[in-house]
Amino acid sequence: MAQEQTKRGGGGGDDEDVTGTTAAGQERREKLAQDTDDLLDEIDDVLEENAEDFVRAYVQKGGQ
């Protein structure tokens, strides 16, 4: 079977659009990184307070 290949060129356009998109993407990455750090801190707090119950909740029953 023959496969068709298509090439797409960059649309050209304004560099300001790219800069705005890049800045928005950077903001989003920073926000997600902060949210991830907050979640990991919360998990650490739970583990410090009650690690045994946390582990027990994830142990599979029946020797599996």
From Swiss-Prot:
<feature type="modified residue" description="Deamidated glutamine">
    <location>
        <position position="64"/>
    </location>
</feature>
<keyword id="KW-0833">Ubl conjugation pathway</keyword>
<comment type="pathway">
    <text>Protein degradation; proteasomal Pup-dependent pathway.</text>
</comment>
<dbReference type="GO" id="GO:0031386">
    <property type="term" value="F:protein tag activity"/>
</dbReference>
<comment type="subunit">
    <text>Strongly interacts with the proteasome-associated ATPase ARC through a hydrophobic interface; the interacting region of Pup lies in its C-terminal half. There is one Pup binding site per ARC hexamer ring.</text>
</comment>
<comment type="similarity">
    <text>Belongs to the prokaryotic ubiquitin-like protein family.</text>
</comment>
<dbReference type="GO" id="GO:0019941">
    <property type="term" value="P:modification-dependent protein catabolic process"/>
</dbReference>
<feature type="coiled-coil region">
    <location>
        <begin position="25"/>
        <end position="52"/>
    </location>
</feature>
<dbReference type="GO" id="GO:0010498">
    <property type="term" value="P:proteasomal protein catabolic process"/>
</dbReference>
<dbReference type="GO" id="GO:0070490">
    <property type="term" value="P:protein pupylation"/>
</dbReference>
<dbReference type="InterPro" id="IPR008515">
    <property type="entry name" value="Ubiquitin-like_Pup"/>
</dbReference>
<feature type="region of interest" description="Disordered">
    <location>
        <begin position="1"/>
        <end position="37"/>
    </location>
</feature>
<dbReference type="Pfam" id="PF05639">
    <property type="entry name" value="Pup"/>
</dbReference>
<keyword id="KW-1017">Isopeptide bond</keyword>
<feature type="cross-link" description="Isoglutamyl lysine isopeptide (Gln-Lys) (interchain with K-? in acceptor proteins)">
    <location>
        <position position="64"/>
    </location>
</feature>
<protein>
    <recommendedName>
        <fullName>Prokaryotic ubiquitin-like protein Pup</fullName>
    </recommendedName>
</protein>
<feature type="region of interest" description="ARC ATPase binding">
    <location>
        <begin position="21"/>
        <end position="58"/>
    </location>
</feature>
<comment type="function">
    <text>Protein modifier that is covalently attached to lysine residues of substrate proteins, thereby targeting them for proteasomal degradation. The tagging system is termed pupylation.</text>
</comment>
<dbReference type="GO" id="GO:0070628">
    <property type="term" value="F:proteasome binding"/>
</dbReference>
<keyword id="KW-0175">Coiled coil</keyword>
